[in-house]
Amino acid sequence: MESTDAKKLEKPEWSDKAKDKDGQPIIATATASFEISKLCNPTKILLEKGVRYHLEIDAPPNSWSDGGFQVPVGGFSANQPPIWYHRILLGLGVPLRRELTQDWFRIVLRYGRVGGEEVFLDPDPEDSKIEANIRPTRDGELFIFVNDAVIGVPGLYDFFYRNNGGGGKLTLTRKY
């Protein structure tokens, strides 16, 4: 993953929610949209090491798909397994899965430079909104993607992502 132009990241577009007595933001938010058909979605949001963030991911229920098969928002889980014939196809693709130990279509956040830190978000089977708290251990741009198969051949890296449909909106709240 390549970082977005650094000049765009110098001042993320945080919207102030409240200020302390010195006029410093206490809570600020930033948003970004993402598509699950992209190998990686840069957000242009720069995270700071050690700062606490709360994030929410919203996507319309039943809006994600993989080659025509419906996928739960946030990926499959033991509570929401794929239908049996889709499970067979996904089983054949496990050796190509981007993150072998994570479920298919699990949302992954990556920050830092190339090969940075990753956080995997667990879906809520009752709600299409996913929430989590993070505290990065390094500075860097926030990227978001889903866990699907990849091919290590130039031009084909995103082959299995191309048939995915849907996306969502990430809202990140910075807490001072």
Residue map of PLM features:
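Gly-Asp-aromatic-enriched flexible segments
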Residues: 1-176
